[in-house]
Amino acid sequence: MIKLLHLVDNSLQSQTAAKCDLLIHIGTSKLQYAIIDKVRDELKALAEYVLPEISNLNDLIFAIEKLPECKREFKYPFNKIRVSFDSHKFTFIPEELYENEKEQEYSKYINPSTSDLILTNRIRSAKIKNIFAIDTIFNAGLNQIFHKPRIYSQATSFIEGIKKTNPDRNGTCLFIDFHKNHIQIACLKKSDLELYNILECYNADEFNYFLLSVIEALNLDISNCNLIVSGDVASENDEYYQRILKYFPTPVFSDSKLIVNHPEMFHNIIPHTYFSLLSLGECE
């Protein structure tokens, strides 16, 4: 893997890891991880790697196992290890309607393959259950690499993050999280979750179409709607951002410093880039 970022506080040692959580996101093109000191509520490590071209899940697991962290940091006795991955196979059930014995019935909504395992996360702030599929080989690989990881789909962390940092709890907010080949998009109205989806998106024209479709479907008054962006997007020379400005003249960037404190060594990090990763720390 190609290393894009690797910042680690020198005070992070095996003997201090018990007060820390390890957060890992495995995307379609990148692997990111962070280590959070839960006692001091501050960031201790942040790293990002480009994933190699892979043809199957065994190759992905092998690539992760080859990371130097698998022989060092990932072996530390952390308080909790949380791992998220990108999945289009998910559905939400309100907590008041959810019944454990009906999990397999709920899973029919996501059309799992025969090799999939069904997992469930609670999205506490939205009072919903997130039911999603993970390939059994991938699940077994994660449990082999990491010690008792809690596994999430990307939806859980993103929703927990936007609920925590919602800038207008009595208004309407549209959140868009950009990645190489997809976007996450969510809407909160008076703090209630109105919409969440993950969409394959390969160019600005596709994004423009999705944005207009969401505006129309939710009947959004864009003059009274806050737009918050995160992920791989910039305010200059970014075609996606220019499309946003056509409809929302004053978008704002999410701020991961509202999730966890960033000591001085992390001050050069663009706060919105790792918003979804750091929001994993808000998950149960």
What are these regions (language model features)?
Residues 28-57, 191-205:
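Short glycine-rich, Thr/Ser-proximal phosphate-binding strand/loop in the N-terminal lobe
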Residues 21-25, 82, 173-177:
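Short glycine-aspartate micro-motif
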Residues 1-40, 281-283:
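N-terminal basic/disordered segments at the start of proteins
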Residues 198-274:
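Accessory, usually C-terminal, subdomains that scaffold auxiliary metal cofactors
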Residues 46-73, 205-219, 223-226:
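N-terminal phosphate-binding loop and adjacent alpha-helix
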Residues 26-28, 83-88, 179, 229-234:
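Structural motif
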Residues 2, 30, 122-220:
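Small-residue (GG/TT-enriched) beta-loop-alpha framework at ligand/catalytic clefts
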Residues 36, 44-53, 62-163, 258-261:
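Active-site neighborhood for divalent-cation/phosphate handling
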